[in-house]
Amino acid sequence: MKSKIALTFDKCKKAKRPALITYTVAGDNTKNNSLKILNKISKHADILELGFPHNTPIADGGQIQGSSHRALENGIKLKDVFQIVKKFKKNNLSKPLVLMGYYNLIYQKGENNFLKSCKSSGVDGLIIVDLPYPENKNFSYKCKKRSINFIQLLSPTTSKDRMKKIIKDSH
């Protein structure tokens, strides 16, 4: 069975248009407004990315770093991110939602506990910016077992050989 993310890309391809994927950081503005923001952008977006803030977002640009800083100042915690997702998915079950963030928070919570929270809140996919291939293989397998897409990143400097391996191992 295809994932919601794959079905969404299929739908966009059939309509001969690119998918609109939006991004916001949970808790930037306020915890309560995060849900309102997701609901508003979901009316136009095909897939939503929701960042879980980290205190040292070194792989992100200035805009996301600033958003993460504001979210943390607003007191956002990982448990709050899952509550936001769960509330959003209550009325938007078919809209794919991808969490994006850093492995340190997953490590602190424990991979299995983190993935359990992802599944129970309705997360469809994960982007973990600081967990590269092949170090991510075990975590990727755990995601696959739980039907959570693990989205890996490529850069313009990724070699063709490495790209083939990453694509082969993606789901």
Residue ranges and their predicted role:
Residues 1-12, 54-66, 73-86, 106-112, ...:
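Active-site-adjacent beta->alpha loops and helix N-cap segments on the catalytic face
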Residues 8-28, 61-67, 89-100:
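N-terminal small/glycine-rich loop or linker at the start of catalytic domains
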Residues 10, 42, 86-92, 119, ...:
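Acidic (Asp/Glu)-rich catalytic clusters
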Residues 12-18, 45-58:
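N-terminal glycine-rich anion-binding loops that anchor highly charged ligand groups
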Residues 20-24, 48-50, 97-101, 126-128, ...:
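Hydrophobic faces of well-ordered beta-strands that scaffold small-molecule active sites
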Residues 22, 41, 48-51, 118, ...:
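Conserved, mostly hydrophobic/aromatic
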Residues 30-42, 158-170:
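Catalytic cores of alpha/beta
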Residues 44-46, 118-124, 144-151, 168-171:
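Glycine-enriched alpha-helix->loop->beta-strand junction motifs that scaffold or abut catalytic
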